[in-house]
């Protein structure tokens, strides 16, 4: 069984449309948006683990790099996973307020590019929509592989710059260029975007991610995170994937 076989059966058009409908709530109602994304991500990781290892993910330890305020912790706890979140920004760690205070999992304030964990210390290392927010995404990826046990899974998912969501709250203006889009947003809103090009948002391509992952010798799957299964072929087509694979998932298994 291929590592993606189980999840591929869930990757339907209705799922894609349901998740797409939640994106408009990312800023006005983050609990709704991230709650839906967290549940879907926990299912994704559970399916990948079961297909790869032939056993339930329950009882395993997962390190979430860039875990934010803990929305994902609840979803993984419900799956029986031991959750550890890593987040460098104290504002992000407390963004959910009292709703997640004292919730499941444990949290560490640290950078994903220098994880304070021993080699081979977790079963699964996840990074969801973080790589495009750091200046050295493949250093983050290397750290994820370092802390993942042989036979475990490192799952790195990120927003592709030239896809329709690459500009985040700047909208499609990122097609004019990142710096120009950032300046335009600041003029219109009177303040920089939260995801500000050049400081908290960077242009990361699908080709870069695939090249890095293949170079590690540990890549076992790559597919568009939010697309239905019948559209996964786009990942294999240069240039097309940059515009139509809005979010790329890289699944790696250290040996």
Swiss-Prot record:
<dbReference type="GO" id="GO:0008757">
    <property type="term" value="F:S-adenosylmethionine-dependent methyltransferase activity"/>
</dbReference>
<keyword id="KW-0489">Methyltransferase</keyword>
<dbReference type="GO" id="GO:0032259">
    <property type="term" value="P:methylation"/>
</dbReference>
<protein>
    <recommendedName>
        <fullName>Uncharacterized methyltransferase MMAR_0473</fullName>
        <ecNumber>2.1.1.-</ecNumber>
    </recommendedName>
</protein>
<dbReference type="InterPro" id="IPR029063">
    <property type="entry name" value="SAM-dependent_MTases_sf"/>
</dbReference>
<dbReference type="InterPro" id="IPR013216">
    <property type="entry name" value="Methyltransf_11"/>
</dbReference>
<keyword id="KW-0808">Transferase</keyword>
<comment type="similarity">
    <text>Belongs to the methyltransferase superfamily.</text>
</comment>
<dbReference type="Pfam" id="PF08241">
    <property type="entry name" value="Methyltransf_11"/>
</dbReference>
């Amino acid at each position: 069984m291929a590592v993606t076989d189980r999840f591929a059966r869930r990757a339907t058009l209705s799922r894609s449309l349901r998740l797409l409908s939640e994106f408009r709530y990312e800023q006005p109602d983050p609990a709704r948006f991230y709650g839906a994304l967290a549940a879907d991500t926990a299912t994704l990781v559970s399916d990948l683990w079961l297909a790869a290892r032939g056993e339930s993910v329950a009882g395993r330890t997962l390190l979430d790099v860039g875990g934010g305020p803990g929305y994902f912790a609840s979803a993984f706890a419900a799956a029986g996973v031991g959750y550890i979140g890593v987040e460098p920004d104290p504002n992000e760690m407390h963004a959910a307020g009292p709703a997640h205070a004292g919730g499941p999992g444990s949290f560490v304030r640290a950078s994903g590019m220098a994880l304070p964990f021993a080699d081979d210390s977790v079963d699964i290392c996840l990074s969801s929509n973080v790589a495009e927010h750091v200046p050295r995404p493949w250093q983050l990826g290397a750290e994820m592989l370092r802390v993942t046990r042989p036979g475990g899974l490192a799952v790195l998912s990120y927003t592709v710059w030239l896809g329709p969501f690459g500009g985040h709250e700047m909208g499609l203006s990122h097609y004019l260029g990142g710096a120009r889009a950032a300046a335009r947003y600041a003029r219109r809103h009177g303040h920089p975007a939260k995801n500000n090009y050049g400081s908290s948002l960077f242009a990361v391509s699908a080709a870069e991610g695939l090249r890095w992952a293949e170079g590690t010798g540990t890549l076992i799957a790559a597919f568009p995170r939010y697309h239905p299964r019948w559209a996964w072929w786009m990942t294999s087509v240069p240039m097309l994937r940059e515009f139509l694979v809005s979010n790329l998932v890289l699944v790696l298994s250290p040996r």
